[in-house]
Design a protein with these regions (language model features):
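N-terminal cap/lid segment of alpha/beta-hydrolase-fold proteins
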Residues: 1-23, 263, 267-314, 570
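Alpha/beta-hydrolase active-site loop
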Residues: 41, 73-94, 368-392
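Glycine-rich "HGGG/HGxG" loop immediately N-terminal to the catalytic nucleophile
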Residues: 60-75, 353-370
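Catalytic active-site module of serine/aspartate enzymes centered on a nucleophile-bearing elbow/loop
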Residues: 243, 248-289, 562-612
């Protein structure tokens, strides 16, 4: 697994185990939120193929993931198609394979078809086969799904009602879903696509994975179209796609489907070998959007990260973004990529971190559950990353986390004396214990089903066929999600008997003690909550509704923010978070400068005073 870049795109080469390969695969990821949801599955599909002797190149399209660009570029479709073509050529050059297979999912499958047609223009350049997983056959239907999902995440009014009839953004301004944007031009190009009406077949062999098999299946229609054009087509059910197409903190690899793909591409492969371990190249510098990014392996190669630094400057401080839930290092809505580069352009460094069980780290798990985000392992991983940064000369290290990442940031500051600042947003827990695991798993099945359904893009196809009403889904799933978050934050199982028999709120006691300790050690900490965030119930329980128990702690500040959604996926929320990061960094540097002046003058260091 080697890092590579081309044409502004960042990607990975998964080298094949065993003898020299003759066939390689280019993975074409879905787009927007679906790329985040499926990252775990796509990364492990690449690992599985490499272990079976098939090298794989996977990458982020321009404007997505770790690649260059802000996102929402008008020319997304033609640029992405050209990137797939370039990736195929790069795979051939790097591995010596003769045949290339394009393997795509959802819109990525559609882009693979378009790229295959473009490659066929060059003699000998056409792909040997296509693997199309739940392809977007009808672009207009795909856009309707996106609008429906946007309606689900539409803002609530003061009474908690959601206007499900309104799309997130009008079509003449493009479409924004969970902070991922489609420009009007890209929408027009996608809306005009009908794979089952394009002439001919894009490859001689095609494997289709159908996630909604039945009489109305668009994939079945596409299979018939390709067969009539002379292709050999295999169609298999993709029932386990629901394991993949959901929020990363609860998603898993669709093992059955991945085995089918590996067997189809490498039927003569020997018993599955372990995929090769990642190799750190001597020079991983990637000049992107006015900054420089380095791929780094931390903690004896157990963790992967992207170190983002100013171009030509020595940064005085660094911000560390740990994973949120099960998302990989780019962050929900690509937030950590955009924040990292914004910080670097302002003269600071940033590290986007994958703990050892997530993202692109070598030992990333094949499934995820919420309690794992709070487990001892990730806490130790983050502290090890802090040690790695300190060993490289960073004296000001700020942890910056969202939701479970806020918890990891707090724990890192408590465990590691090298942490000098913390900005934590919308924390739902300050203390995680065994009983919290039990509480998470004991919730009603209907609640978990609603949460999964709300995040499952495939359900929107059923909605478009009128199988269930949008308003009922919106109201039920939104209410369930709020209830689940409040239950986690309130933590009703965290009370215990004190020495004298009185009832003690263990999490309250822990949180207050943690803040007191950090303030004593002069760690600058900003505690942020959105004005309606479910985590405010926890904050009120631990610190008082007005944060009164924090008022006498000079280094601790608490804030209710009008523009801060829970997962920090919206643009205004990122702006709010960035503003507090800059305040925290500048506050540290001012204090450090004052201490340096005092030290030079032989004066004792000043005692910290309460923040206003």
């Amino acid at each position: 697994m080697k890092r590579l870049t081309f044409d502004g795109c960042a990607g990975w080469l998964h080298e094949a185990a065993g003898k020299a390969a003759t066939t390689g695969v280019v993975l074409c990821a879905p787009h927007m939120h679906e790329a985040m949801w499926t990252h775990r599955g796509m990364r492990h599909l690449a690992d599985d193929l490499a272990a079976a002797g098939v090298p794989v190149l996977r990458f982020d399209y321009y404007g997505t993931g770790d690649s260059a660009g802000d996102g929402g570029e008008p020319d997304f479709v033609p640029r992405a198609v050209q990137s797939v073509v370039t990736a195929a050529a790069r795979l051939r050059a790097l591995t010596g394979v003769q045949d290339v297979v394009l393997c795509g999912m959802r819109l990525g499958a559609t882009l693979a078809v378009l790229a295959s047609e473009a490659m066929a223009v060059d003699a000998g350049g056409a792909p040997a086969a296509l693997v199309l997983m739940a392809p977007v056959v009808n672009g207009r239907a795909y856009l309707r799904e996106l609008r429906a999902l946007g309606a689900f995440y539409a803002p609530e009014d003061a009474d908690g009602r959601t206007d499900a009839a309104q799309p997130a953004v009008a079509d003449d301004n493009g479409l924004e879903i969970l902070s991922y944007r489609l420009a009007p031009q890209a929408m027009q190009e996608i809306g005009s696509l009908r794979l089952d009406r394009r002439p001919g077949t894009p490859a001689r062999r095609v494997l289709l994975l159908d996630d909604v098999p039945g009489s109305a299946s668009a994939v079945a229609s596409l299979a018939q179209h390709y067969q009539q054009a002379g292709a050999h087509v295999d169609v298999v059910d993709f029932h386990d796609s629901r394991l993949l197409m959901k929020s990363p903190e609860v998603s898993a690899v669709p093992e059955t489907s991945w085995r089918r793909i590996v067997e189809w591409l490498a039927p003569d492969a020997a018993a599955k070998a372990a995929p090769p371990q990642p190799a750190e190249d001597a020079d991983t510098a990637f000049e992107v959007d006015g900054v420089v990014e380095h791929s780094v392996w931390i903690d004896n190669g157990r963790q992967f990260g992207v170190l983002c630094v100013p171009d030509g400057e020595t940064p005085p401080a660094i911000v560390v973004f740990p994973n949120t839930g099960g998302s990989h290092h780019v962050g929900d809505g690509r937030a950590f990529v955009l924040l990292s580069r914004a910080l670097a352009r302002r003269g600071f460094a940033a590290l986007r971190l994958d703990v050892s069980t997530l993202g692109d780290s070598p030992g990333a798990a094949r499934e995820m559950a919420v309690p794992r985000a709070y487990a001892p392992g990730p806490r130790a991983d983050v502290s090890a990353a802090v040690d790695w940064l300190r060993a490289r000369g960073y004296s000001h290290i700020v942890m910056a986390g969202v939701c479970s990442g806020a918890y990891l940031s707090l724990q890192a500051a408590l465990a590691n004396e090298h942490v000098t600042g913390v900005v934590m947003a919308n924390a739902l827990k300050y203390l995680w214990r065994d009983e919290d695991d039990a509480a998470h798993h004991s919730g009603p099945e209907r609640l978990r089903d609603y949460l999964h359904a709300a995040r499952d893009a495939r359900n929107w196809q059923r909605l478009m066929r009128g199988e269930f009403p949008l308003r009922k889904i919106v109201a039920g799933a939104a209410q369930a999600a709020r209830g689940a978050a409040r239950k986690l934050a309130v933590g009703g199982h965290s009370r215990q008997a004190g020495k004298s028999g009185e009832t003690v709120d263990a999490e309250q006691e822990y949180a207050r003690g943690a803040m007191t300790r950090l303030s004593r050690h002069r760690v600058q900490l900003d505690l942020l909550y959105g004005v309606d965030d479910a985590g405010l119930a926890l904050a009120g329980r631990c610190f008082g509704d007005d944060f009164s128990h924090l008022h006498d702690l000079p280094c601790i500040s608490a804030h209710r923010c009008a523009q801060l959604d829970h997962a920090m996926i919206l643009g205004p929320s990122r702006d709010t978070f960035l503003a507090f990061l800059m305040q925290n960094l500048r506050r540290q540097l001012v204090i450090a400068d004052a201490a340096s002046v005092q030290a030079a003058a032989g004066e004792p260091a000043a005692t910290a005073t309460a923040a206003g």
